[in-house]
Amino acid sequence: MASHRLLLLCLAGLVFVSEAGPTGAGESKCPLMVKVLDAVRGSPAVNVAVNVFKRAADETWEPFASGKTSESGELHGLTTEEEFVEGIYKVEIDTKSYWKALGISPFHEHAEVVFAANDSGPRRYTIAALLSPYSYSTTAVVTNPKE
C-alpha cells in the first residue's frame, strides 16, 4: 500500500512539473490535455489512442474527441474552450493496444477517467495516467485559465 501511495505521489509530481511551463506553441490555451507514461520503461507512452466522451441528457456517452499521444506522451488540441462546456466527460485510454504493440499481454482493455468539468466556471484539465501491463494509476491537475 505504501508503494502504491509513493507511485501516486511520483505521478502527481511528474504532472505538476510538466505543467510548470508550456511544451509547445498554443498549448497553454488547451482546456483538456492527456499525458500517458509507461511505468515499465520509464518513458512517455507514445502513440496511445485516447477517446473522450460527453454524457448526454439520456445518460449515454456521446463521442466528443479523439487522438493519439505524441512522442512526449501528451495529447493536446482535443477541444477548444468554446466546445468544452460544463458536463460529465469520460477519457478512455486504449491500454490494451499499447501493450500488445510492445508484445505484452495486458490485463486491462483500457483505463478510464470520468469527471465533471467546468461546473465552477472554465478550468484547464490535465489527466495523467501511469501504465503498467497489470495496473494503472491516474491523477488530474485542474487549474484556472490564465488571463
Swiss-Prot record:
GO cellular component, one term: extracellular space
Key words, A-Z: Gamma-carboxyglutamic acid, Glycoprotein, Hormone, Phosphoprotein, Secreted, Signal, Sulfation, Thyroid hormone, Transport
Modified residues (4-carboxyglutamate): E62
Recorded GO MF terms: hormone activity; thyroid hormone binding
Binding site for L-thyroxine: K35, E74, S137
Positions of modified residues (Sulfocysteine): C30
Tissues showing expression: Detected in liver.
Leader sequence residues: 1-20
UniProt record, GO biological process: purine nucleobase metabolic process
Keyword Transport listed: yes
Family: Belongs to the transthyretin family.
The protein's role, per its UniProt record: Thyroid hormone-binding protein. Probably transports thyroxine from the bloodstream to the brain.
UniProt protein name: Transthyretin
Native organism: Pongo abelii (Sumatran orangutan)
Upper taxonomic lineage: Eukaryota, Metazoa, Chordata, Craniata, Vertebrata
Gene: TTR
